């Protein structure tokens, strides 16, 4: 806050009056701008701004101490307010100065100079980095510094509604043309003596003078237009479009009020105060939009003024003293439009000028030397009463829109002032009020008429301008006083020419503007060239200034003078003097202003030259003016202005010295900023490289994820295929198990059948043995019979020899015997038929036996094949089970390896995360280092908020990770329990497999035993076959012998013709024999049927047992299949869950990395966006970033702790799971051992029990067989006794037959002797065959006539009887021996055929004995032949 004032002065009455003070409110950072107040303590609008508040605010913000801002206020009494109003309306600046500061002007000027010299460096020292021009202005350059940076800074922030008497608050929003200035109040045409001075640039005189050169104006305007970027344009246009519809109803009314003549200055200020509060609330964007609206309205108003007041040419001849005073007035008005120097776009900094309008009115009637410009209007004060408002952004925006809109009307940025002293009838002639002639422009296009020469040498143009103006100054003396109109017309023509030139040059500006955007790299070179050109131009200007031939121009090159209507009270010479003063003033000010644009080394020498040249110029002007205005009033004023110019030059020199120091400081700052920019570029490159690396890593991670997903899919497909194959194999195994069970049942059935076959074979072998014994006995009997027959034949021959003599007597007997023989032959034929039937039956039985044996062989072969298949399937199943077990073990190993790999991957990922964190920490440190030099407070707050969000996200993520870790721990516990259950199931399956393997071993042993037994049976069968062959051979030999015996029997029967009784007995015996034979055959058939039934029953029992065992095998296979399914399901679930857990862990880790990468990307984007803005608050950012780093370190430390805890918990759980698995494995192994031992013990006990049962059965069978043998022996004994009785009876019959034979023999001998001669031939004819053996006996002469000796016959009969008795004894002995042997063999064979009953043995013995008895009877019958 600043204030200006003066000392109190008494009025005419001498009464004290309240003082009026002018204040400016300097708002805090972030407000819209500086706001000026002019008032007195009694006003309502000024009551809220006491001096104490102003002092405190200044002391708190600027820390000036006892500087310029602590100067006393200018007190104005209420009586002088009317005069102050009139002077302000009429444009009488000296009158206003006189009212505000009636004391010595020199002292006040010195005080103001000192205050300004103190204010500028102090304000600069206390400027924050935010307020520096290089940070906020893109067109800033160190060479463009003005005399007062404070005023420049304040002029940037001025508002439209600042408190000045000539302010128009705001414009309507529908006006499109851009304006830089507030609208001034203008009087009517009859009362208007002066115009408005418009402040359109900077507040410094340096920029004013420099900008008055046309070439400088052109170059600066072009540079200003070129340095506007597209981003600023878009922002401003958007701000204008979006935020204009505010305060439209109030602004035109305010403008109309300000246009009226009678409206005072101060009543506007309360409304301005209200608008200020509204501006603070609305913000920056609304402020920009309303400023734009003000510019638009000002542009239209100035266009109307220009049309209303056509600009005539001002007189070029004015007194030198008036020009000096004019120079002071303009010097007091800080304004500069174009302070852009080419090449400043690289540093993104430029000054922006603001123009201030003064308005003076020619109603001051008492001018004097005191009415010269007061220090109150000094340019270094930063603001004046009549400052309207403008902003640096106005000028940039106007220049930009001027390039876009060529035909829109604009205003001039700088107007030179022209004071005119007029004489009144009631006042002295010496007093002439100063009139400020307003120079303005109609068109906005003319505002930028010299921008084409932006990249050209601006200073060379300025020198040419001075050269062109030199003849004008020389021609001033030659011009007559009446040449005012011609000069005005000439100036008007020049103005029109310049406007046309500007219109032609606007089109080229657009092309150059686009080219300048592409030539950013060459701007540094252009800066250096422009600096050298400025130096060269400064030397040229020093020469031109010493000659005094330069003429000043406005900042825009549009120094058009608005014509003033001459009243009746004004004279033509006054107009001339005012115009000459204007020219002299314009001649002086460019020199002073241009000195500021030169290098610091040239300022001192040039200031010395300026002081001398100014003095010479004044003297020349005095001579030229001659004696027209050399009265007592004008000469002191000229002298005062001269003194003021000297003071100003001194101030300028001092200020230039300060500027040199400041320039050096700013150059150092620029170098530092350039270094910082290079560092920021490097950091940008590093960040971009890091981004690229992170993107590559993300791409790699995504590829790895895709590959893992593909591998998982392939694994799932393989797993499904394997599961299907396993199911198919399980089904096949089930089928195989079923077939195995069926085979086992068949094996058992076949084993039983083999046992039965063995038993049957044993029986057959026994029968064969018995038959062989019988055959041997029969052979022995036949041998005996042969011997007996031979002896009988011999006896018969002897008897025939003896009975030849008795043949004749026996013819009749022979006939009888022949009949008997026929009968016997018939009987023999019947016997042969019976024998054939018996043989056929035996053959059929043999065929049946052979067929049974072949069926048994086939069955054995099938059984062997089935056993082989079973063995193969068993081996295959064993191999499959072993393979499955190996697969299970391999899968367990793979799972363990996968778990280990997962652990390793987790460790590797943790290491990578740590490395990423280290990188992130390094990157964050680098970013922090770059941020500490570049970031702003607001963006830092955003980053802090983002960091807080990230911190919250990290907390949320940590909580989520903890929850996920808990879920994973639960899943691990569930998996462990499932693994335990699976292991238990594995152990159970292993136990079942062990049991099945034991069962299979038993089956194999049984099979091996059955094979051995089968081999034994085959060997026995082969032996039996050989025996059968021998038996058949023997049977054939027996049949042959039987045939021989039959032939012999025929012979014997021929001899037994006479034994009729014997025939009858033989018939009886034959009938009995036949009955016995039939009974024996029936018994054999019954026994065979019983055996068949018993075999069928046994087969049924075996089939039942086979079915039962098959059902048990099916149950076992079903249980096995269920266990396999459980195993497969467990195998499927365990790896899938492990993979799912690994995938979740990887996804979590990737999500963490992605979140961190996203956070880093956001940070990088915010860093890149906020580089420029965050430069000014380095210290605060450092502190904040240190805190952030500490908090991040804490967060990372907490993260590490949580991760370490999670890892430890997982490792502990895994170790516990492994220990439990090991324990369970040991327990299961022990259980297996115990189960095996239990199985072995149970099997042993079962075997012992079965052995005991078998032993008990064997003992029982032995006892029963012994009893049976005893009973059979007793029966055999009884039978034997009966047979002995029968034999005794037979022997008695034989003895009787012998007696009968002896009697018959005696009778035969008698009959033979009687009928020898008669019946010899007839006997031979009738019985040739029978009588053939007796032929030799008949021829034998010796035997015919012999006598019969009966003693010899008796001896032969006795021998026969003795022989038969011996045979009977042998037979008895053999029978007893056979019975004893059969009993022993029966005892030995009872265990194999325990089911064989005693009745069957009895029947077998009877069947065996019957043919033996028959043979004996035959032999006995044969022994009964008549001897």
From Swiss-Prot:
Residues 1-32, 87-189, 213-261, 453-485, 528-586 are annotated as: Disordered. It comes from the Eukaryota. The keyword Coiled coil applies. Residues 129-150, 167-178, 453-467 have a biased composition (Polar residues). InterPro entries: C144A/B/C, CC144C-like_CC_dom, DUF3496. Keywords: Coiled coil. Residues 490-545, 648-1129, 1155-1309 form a coiled coil. Residues 543-552 have a biased composition (Low complexity). Residues 1-11, 528-537, 563-584 have a biased composition (Basic and acidic residues). Residues 224-234 have a biased composition (Acidic residues). Pfam families: CCDC144C, DUF3496. The keyword Cell inner membrane does not apply. Belongs to the CCDC144 family. May play a role in preventing the formation of kidney stones through inhibition of calcium oxalate monohydrate (COM) crystallization, attenuating COM-induced apoptotic injury to renal epithelial cells. May exhibit antilithiatic (preventing the formation of kidney stones) activity through crystal binding, hindering the crystal attachment to renal epithelial cells, a pre-requisite to initiate inflammatory response. PANTHER family: COILED-COIL DOMAIN-CONTAINING PROTEIN 144A-RELATED. This is Coiled-coil domain-containing protein 144A. It comes from Homo sapiens.
